[in-house]
Design a protein with these regions (language model features):
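Divalent metal-dependent phosphate-bond-processing catalytic cores, especially two-metal-ion Mg2+/Mn2+ enzymes
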Residues: 20-28, 32-44, 57, 68, ...
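Short alpha-helical hairpin
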Residues: 1-13, 54-60
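Glycine- and acidic
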Residues: 14-18
Length: 234
């Protein structure tokens, strides 16, 4: 599984590009996290293997996205594109996707980055798990560096404030300022499905590490307190 993924990345993309390297390691970490959560949930071995595989492949659309556009989230929906790639016979063979697992793989990859799952998949355990693992690693990455926005102001947009206080994730197009970005990161926690994912988030102290890296900490204190209380209550 990992060998095929490594060959796919190294043979088709420029690994010297930081964005490609970052997505490669993100994919491997999400795969590891997915396996860990599935094991904690005592899933059958075959389901654990599938969760591990989908975790590795969830961002496969990102590599072409960067190569074509040199940016993320502007011109392409990488979840939809990733599912399109994995639906091709050559990718199915390359990654040894079993025919009876294919629809599960396609659905999970397609919807992993959407604001919410459709009603038909809201209880799908693979979709829920991969979304958890992905968010946990995104929060980890943001805990390791400063948040950078072109509009570096501590002003929260009306739409972002409303969504945050409703307890929902933030719509990407509403994120316009540094403050919006901070709240959008915190709001990822609202969409975490499994208690064990929240336990990992708490144990690794990612939320407080993000707070420690902030500019103008006092402005954000109440929002961080709210999220930490939410984690404790869940």
């Amino acid at each position: 599984m990992y060998r095929e993924f490594e060959e796919f990345v190294f043979n088709n993309y420029d690994f010297n590009e930081p964005a490609i390297k970052r997505k490669y390691y993100h994919s491997k970490r999400v795969s590891t996290i997915s396996k860990k959560i599935a094991e904690n949930l005592a899933w059958p071995l075959e389901d654990i293997k599938l969760a591990t595989q989908i975790g590795l492949l969830h961002d496969i659309g990102r590599f072409d996205e960067w190569t074509m556009y040199k940016c993320f989230n502007k011109y392409m929906d990488h979840g939809s594109y990733g599912a399109y790639l994995l639906n091709k016979e050559e990718y199915e063979k390359m990654f040894n996707i079993k025919s009876y697992d294919k629809q599960e793989v396609l659905d999970t990859v397609y919807y992993h980055n959407k604001l919410k799952l459709p009603a038909s998949l809201k209880d799908n355990k693979f979709c829920k798990l991969i979304r958890d693992a992905d968010k946990l690693d995104i929060i980890y990455q943001l805990s390791q560096r400063e948040i950078v926005m072109e509009n570096n102001t501590h002003v929260i947009s009306k739409e972002v404030f409303k969504e945050f206080n409703k307890g929902t994730t933030i719509t990407n197009k509403h994120i316009k300022t540094y403050a919006d970005k901070v709240l959008s990161i915190l709001a990822l926690v609202y969409d975490i499905n499994y208690a064990y994912t929240l336990e990992l988030l708490k144990n690794f102290n990612y939320i407080n590490k993000i707070y420690d890296n902030l500019e103008n900490k006092e402005f954000y204190k109440d929002y961080f307190d709210k999220i930490n209380k939410y984690i404790e209550k869940r």
